[in-house]
């Protein structure tokens, strides 16, 4: 692994560690967006959220439904951002 890749990996790991317990938005490859409190994340990008809302891709502000706890499989996660 090059120095640049190593630096990027440590920054990504640090970012993910710092947002646990905070509100996040998780975009899936299917186009769905989930917004909730990040409870946990693992090395495979599997994500557990609490107090979660699900939104349509075409209108991120349009609430589809509200869920308490949601588990998202890492292979489906496009990105995670702090809300």
UniProtKB/Swiss-Prot annotation:
State the signal peptide span. none
Q: Where in the cell is it found?
A: Cytoplasm; Nucleus
Q: Subunit structure of this entry?
A: Component of the heptameric LSM1-LSM7 complex, which consists of LSM1, LSM2, LSM3, LSM4, LSM5, LSM6 and LSM7. Component of the heptameric LSM2-LSM8 complex, which consists of LSM2, LSM3, LSM4, LSM5, LSM6, LSM7 and LSM8. The LSm subunits form a seven-membered ring structure with a doughnut shape.
Name of the encoding gene: LSM6
Name of the protein: U6 snRNA-associated Sm-like protein LSm6
Indicate the principal place this protein occupies in or around the cell. cytoplasm
Q: This protein's superkingdom?
A: Eukaryota
Q: Does the keyword tRNA processing apply?
A: yes
The record's listing under SMART domains reads: Sm (SM00651)
Give the keywords, sorted: Cytoplasm, mRNA processing, mRNA splicing, Nucleus, Ribonucleoprotein, RNA-binding, rRNA processing, Spliceosome, tRNA processing
What one GO molecular function would you report for this record? RNA binding
Per the UniProt entry, what are the Gene Ontology biological process annotations, in alphabetical order? Answer: deadenylation-dependent decapping of nuclear-transcribed mRNA; maturation of SSU-rRNA; mRNA splicing, via spliceosome; tRNA processing
Q: What protein family is recorded?
A: Belongs to the snRNP Sm proteins family. SmF/LSm6 subfamily.
- Residue span(s) of domain Sm: 11-83
Summary of the function given for this chain in its UniProt record: Component of LSm protein complexes, which are involved in RNA processing and may function in a chaperone-like manner, facilitating the efficient association of RNA processing factors with their substrates. Component of the cytoplasmic LSM1-LSM7 complex, which is thought to be involved in mRNA degradation by activating the decapping step in the 5'-to-3' mRNA decay pathway. Component of the nuclear LSM2-LSM8 complex, which is involved in splicing of nuclear mRNAs.
One cellular component term (GO) for this entry is:
spliceosomal complex
